[in-house]
Amino acid sequence: MSLLEATLFRGASGVVALHLVDEAVVDRPAGTGVSDHWSVLVLAGAVVAVAVVYPRLPSTGRALLGFIFVPLAGAGAAMHVMDARWNGAHGSDFTGFLLIPAAAAFVAAAVLAVLSRPRARSWPWRIGRWLLTAVVALLLLAFVSLPIAVGVAQTRKPGRSVPESAFATPHQTVTLHTRDGLDLSGWYVPSKNRAAIVVVHGGGGDRRGSRRHAAMLVRHGYGVLLYDARGRGESEGSPNAQGWTWQTDVSAALDFLSQRKDVDQGRIGGLGLSTGADVLLEAGANDPRLKAVVLDGSTSRSLADVRRLKTSDAISGIPYWAVAYGTIAALDQSLPGEPLVDLARKLAPKPALFIASNELGEPVVNRKYAAAYGNPRALWRVDAGHTRGLTEHPQEYERRVIRFFDNSL
């Protein structure tokens, strides 16, 4: 092994470990302590340990390690570059940018490891070994590196400021207090018809992603509460794009609406988008304060969901999602709730409207949810992108959703 190869791998590993420590200690989410991120520090230690033993490994092992680390560093870098593009560089974004040269260094180290094998063997033997290494590397990429990268990205995205000007509808700025001690930032538009809707955004964004839906409801007199889930936007806490920890947030939103003098307690509904739909499906099944729910873009959020769906795509994806969900569970120190199909069964007879787009397998999974709910007619399939029904079919979307809430609340 050359000194250059060792330097490249160890230097890149040091950057990864530095970034993990930066996120877990220096730039950790508001409302959390270092102890809440011990699993990230363990991961940083594991990266350092791999770098220490790296020179002792055979060339094949070194090459595979390099290829495994490439997507991990690359995904982290891409996340911070995109976030900085939309929100401006902040905090751990700066060490996140260093992951770009780190990913390139891992590629270079892997190539050097492949080329460093003894040349005494014949060319056919060497080509065969290279091909075998490539096949194993691709398998590890598909079923280890990429799902781990997905899991890391869904638990590490930092919060960002949300300007008041982002929501043109006249509103009040409010703070929700969760039962586990976090403060969540939100906007509230008082009700004119004694009914109110809590709107829950998708896993990859914040309350700005549900502004158009909120404005639609306001036009028809509904009070609307939209807020940043924990770890998103301006809210405290650690992010979890699968929404496993969001039930306490919804409960805080319902606490807020239950105390409003402009809202009748029996007239509180919910509208969830993507992950927000999964979260409101669970909340609707378990919280009697929520009287009706619109679930726009539910998919799946756990390995149990994937197994229970029993579709060919779901079954083939089990190895991938087992690693991705396992990574999320380890880093966020949380677990998903009941399978969504079971929650759909528990949701009945509470009024529900399932909305499925043409993407992410939504038609298949939502047919199963509506069937478990006991009313296949509760499903509306809209010819649009994921949660883009209101954008691509505004009149029909507004008519269906408002009619549903008018009849249910």
Locate the predicted segments by residue.
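An N-terminal hydrophobic leader/cap segment in hydrolases
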Residues: I127-H177
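Short beta-strand element of the alpha/beta-hydrolase
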Residues: R194-G202
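The serine-hydrolase catalytic nucleophile loop
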Residues: G203-M216, A229, E236, V365
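Catalytic histidine-centered segment of alpha/beta-hydrolase-like enzymes
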Residues: G385-E398
